[in-house]
A protein has these predicted regions:
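HDAC/HDAC-like amidohydrolase catalytic core signature
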Residues: 1-140
């Protein structure tokens, strides 16, 4: 892979999370003039992927498989108690963590673990293989 190419890491499970409509469907803010949908939707990722596949740089992109992170990898950034809380929350249909705008629902764990693992794959490629790497994932996995 040449330096002018971009390694894009992708895993389809990142699309499994439904973020809802954001915090506005939970508690509307009197400070906001209009409610808006949550910006981190599967459709946004689908559109970014489409732009990369159809756009001017499409011939300079190498698509590489992402992966699911392990629980141990997630535990490098979050406590075991928090991981357990998210796992338990997913079992209870759609819920919000700590009363916030963070929605957890069926599909969230697959999406979170896929996005985290895909991001780690891109990071490893950048650090170990000196690739220009990008993880096509969602920000709810920061």
């Amino acid at each position: 892979m040449s330096q002018t190419e971009l390694a894009v890491f992708w895993h389809p499970d990142v699309l499994k999370h439904d973020p809802g409509s954001g915090c506005y469907e939970y508690e509307a803010s009197p400070l906001m003039e209009v409610d808006e949908p949550h910006p981190e939707t599967p459709e946004r990722i689908i559109n970014i992927r489409s732009i990369l596949q159809r756009g001017d740089i499409r011939d300079r992109i190498r698509w590489l498989d992402g992966r699911h992170a392990t629980r141990e990898e997630i535990a490098l950034f979050h406590t075991a108690a928090y991981i357990d809380e998210v796992i338990e929350a997913e079992k209870n249909a759609t819920v919000r963590l700590d009363g916030s705008g963070t929605v957890v629902n069926p599909g969230t764990l697959d999406a979170v673990f896929a996005a985290a693992g895909t991001t780690l794959e891109a990071l490893e490629a950048a650090l170990n293989d000196n690739l220009a790497a990008y993880a096509l994932a969602v920000s709810y996995t920061h």
